[in-house]
Amino acid sequence: MSQPIMLPQGWEARWDPQANAYIYVDQSTGRSQWEVPLNPTFPTSPTPHAPPQRHGRRAYPSAMYAHAYDTPAPHVGPPQPVAGYAEQGTPQFITPGFEGQQPVQQPPYAAVDHVAGQFQQMNIAPGAAPVAGAAAGAYQGAGYAEKQLHSTKTKTVNLIGLQPDVAALDNPPPPALLPANASVTSSAHSQPDPSYQRCTLNAMPTTQSLLNKSKLPLALVMAPYRSIRETDNDPDVPVVEDGVIARCRRCRAYINPFVTFIEGGNRWKCCMCGLSNEVPQLFDWDQRAEKPADRWARKELNHAVVEFVAPTEYMVRPPQPPVYAFVIDVSSAAIQSGMVAVAARTILESLDSLPNADNRTKVAIIAVSTSLHFFSLPADATEAGMLVVPDLTDVFLPKPVDLLVNLTESRPAIESLLAKLSDMFQDSHTVGSALGSGLQAAHQLIGKIGGKIIALGASLPTIGEGVLKARDDPKLLGTSKESQLLNAGNNWYKTFAIECSKNQVSVDMFLFSGTYTDVATLGCLPRYTAGQTYLYPGFNASRSEDAIKFATEFGKVLAMPIGLEAVIRVRASRGIRMSAFHGNFFIRSTDLLALPVVPQDQNYVIELQIEDDIKGSFVVIQTAVLHTTCYGERRIRVITQAMPTTDSIAELYTSADQIALATYLANKAVERSMSHSLDDARNHVTNRLGEMLTVYKNQVTSAAGGASAQLAVPENLLLLPLLCCALTKHVGLREGASIPPDLRAYAQCLLTTLPCQTLIPYIHPRFYSLHNMPPEAGTIGGDDGAMILPPALNLTSEKLERHGLFLIEDGQNIFLWVGHDAVPRLIQDVFDLASYHELQGGKYTLPRLDNPFSERVCNVVDKTREMRRGVYRPQVYVVKSDAEPALRSWALSLLVEDRMDRMSSYAQYLTTVKSKVNGS
């Protein structure tokens, strides 16, 4: 039997059933903590062993080639410090306040090139076991609270000389260590899954001055309309269907797991403003069974994420039907690229997938070139009639009826039109596009109802409304004026977008041009109407890879169960207010976000401020999304998150979420690149990181006031510097005069809309070795029966081998890197070719061959394509190690730990940050 814990005088231990652990309370002050209040002992950290150093060029004995790719990699332990970063025997963990007792010798950082050279000579084996495919965001499933691990103290890590453990990017955020009995039930679902909502801090500072002093950002990161995936074992969102919605009379918060019942259960106390409210009469009544119900089983008291079916008082009009207006560019460029044919075929094949359960869905189709082509689709017709409007200055509808029609009633005419739409304009040699006028016509069609305009453009709008000019001046690229190309070139689009938002109209843009399209300007429409932008540069439907990618993504967009006519409002405990908003929406008032359509898996970031000092032991933040489902039901999705309060900077840093911080910094950097310059945006990321680590060094460790050879970070922020380094090298922000403005603008669209699960690999790609992956990789296994992926490698070219096959992916593209000494058997088994020289680089459709290795490689590629939420289907590019420079450079640019053009390596980036921390 274990010995009882002896506590110091004045302390007592209280059992916390939610945490399944004791919490220790100082009775004199009321202060509580998770660690045992004893005189601490500080065990010596184990001495890390540096890997054997290798000198000069690596030799590749030819005898090894024949079996290199099918020999499984040996089991390796956790990542070790890279030789050349720190001397062997350097302890990497620091106990705050005691690092003075742990002397560390560091290489002289004036010799940056020498350190970088040592880094490049290393070839460290991956330090992670094979992971199941669902592990990328594995914590994003049900019962997140059950998976939380309670940290008892801050661990400080010295980053200098430590190879980043990239597998830790999938770790859950630090837990919110709430006081005992903060929740009225013991449900494991009382806190939201991080894929719905997370905060940059999981402990709330009690004052704004403390927050300012910490230099930590305070922001919510949310994707409230997250998709439900069976492959991730996602549970459905619980729905309260009895019409009983308990709300606070003062702050209008919804009842949730963190309220308190008082006066014998007849009233409940709001956890945000403290007001006492009556419990609704039917709250404890089962209306279906007509008998008393168990209050503690109610969904809103057990689940942080819940939906209420809204009664009529939540409606200003009957729920709108789903409405889709397609505006299709039929100019010569669009026809010749094959875009029109693929788009029409995809719409035709998706008619059964469009949300139309109650047969209310409406559809309109408008073709645009130098004129507007409307199509009459009567309910009793089998053929469509075309009406041409050449007047583009004063757009009007040529017919009052049959242009916007019921999908079910006019199905024959719609199918007939889509089947021959491309052929109708096949002989057109029209150059120019009246896309702006087409958008205006679509708005006139659906503006009285609301809905979604889906615009497909293959050339720059050159006539009619919203004319744009080619402004991609190469002289501006790489200069401080490049930010001009990231802002709208014509205010008409923003004005039109705001008008659309007022009428509950959203716009999605699909852009295909092989030349400049001005994504920055056209992207204004989705940005202010809660839509999304999709770019297909150099699209050519004769390449099956292009056609399949567009058809797949377009089909998923059409089948998406969207929300309609929505508003989002975030409420928080007294003293906290929302100060800034980032994402695709229109800010209708100081705290109300208007979204004509709520697409799945779109991310939003909301900055918070502390107006008044916070007195309670914990705070609650609640997001409410009032929307109409595409099935005609008005609902409120409510997401409630609670976190403890603290007056300790050390606890703030221990609670910080590096994934949420990286997401916040990405949004702020994009905002700054548009308002200032790209250089300023990159500096902003690095400076914010430096400020945070400076405060951590000075306030949490004992190294305050002096220069240090170490770069101390809390263990939970171990990978934040790597993510910041990767962000500054991302195509949306990085330095260089060779990045087309459209690609940069599109990358910024993704940086501000992708949910965390997809954004992090977009910033920090995944890197796998396939030729020697463990035998279980590429097969079904694990407790959840998921596809097992190879161990993730660090993003450095030092991992590449001349005889190897590697996969690099960022969620948008997949690169298969083939070494020029790859053995013929590998080429034969994967590509069905006799030798490396027969292999062609570029976009590629990987064959599934009749051999085990091909099967496993294809499984890894397939799993990579579908492992994350969203509509995107990454294209596969084969990159030969001696390939054309542009493709090779593109793939290598994803290896963010390497030096890139004038941008520093990760080791050098840490040196820069350390200099900022030391004030030099």
Swiss-Prot record:
The keyword Nucleotide-binding is annotated on this UniProt entry: no
Listed Gene3D superfamilies: 2.20.70.10, beta-sandwich domain of Sec23/24 (2.60.40.1670), Sec23/Sec24 helical domain (1.20.120.730), Severin (3.40.20.10), von Willebrand factor, type A domain (3.40.50.410), Zn-finger domain of Sec23/24 (2.30.30.380)
GO CC annotations on file: COPII vesicle coat; endoplasmic reticulum exit site; endoplasmic reticulum membrane; Golgi membrane
Membrane topology: Peripheral membrane protein
UniProt: Zn(2+) binding residues: C248, C251, C270, C273
Region (Zinc finger-like): 248-273
Subcellular localization(s) per the UniProt record: Cytoplasm; Cytoplasmic vesicle, COPII-coated vesicle membrane; Endoplasmic reticulum membrane; Golgi apparatus membrane
Major location (coarse): cytoplasm
Keyword Glycosyltransferase: no
Molecular function terms, GO-annotated: SNARE binding; zinc ion binding
Ranges of residues in domain WW: 5-39
Coiled coil feature spans: none
InterPro entries (alphabetical): ADF-H/Gelsolin-like_dom_sf (IPR029006), Gelsolin-like_dom (IPR007123), Gelsolin-like_dom_sf (IPR036180), Sec23/24_helical_dom (IPR006900), Sec23/24_helical_dom_sf (IPR036175), Sec23/24_trunk_dom (IPR006896), Sec23_24_beta_S (IPR012990), SEC23_SEC24_subfamily (IPR050550)
Protein role: Component of the coat protein complex II (COPII) which promotes the formation of transport vesicles from the endoplasmic reticulum (ER). The coat has two main functions, the physical deformation of the endoplasmic reticulum membrane into vesicles and the selection of cargo molecules.
Similarity remark: Belongs to the SEC23/SEC24 family. SEC24 subfamily.
PANTHER family hit by this protein: SEC24-RELATED PROTEIN (PTHR13803), SECRETORY 24AB, ISOFORM A (PTHR13803:SF39)
Subunit record text: The COPII coat is composed of at least 5 proteins: the SEC23/24 complex, the SEC13/31 complex, and the protein SAR1. Golgi apparatus membrane; Peripheral membrane protein; Cytoplasmic side.
Protein name as it appears in the record: Protein transport protein SEC24
Native source species: Cryptococcus neoformans var. neoformans serotype D (strain B-3501A) (Filobasidiella neoformans)
Gene: SEC24
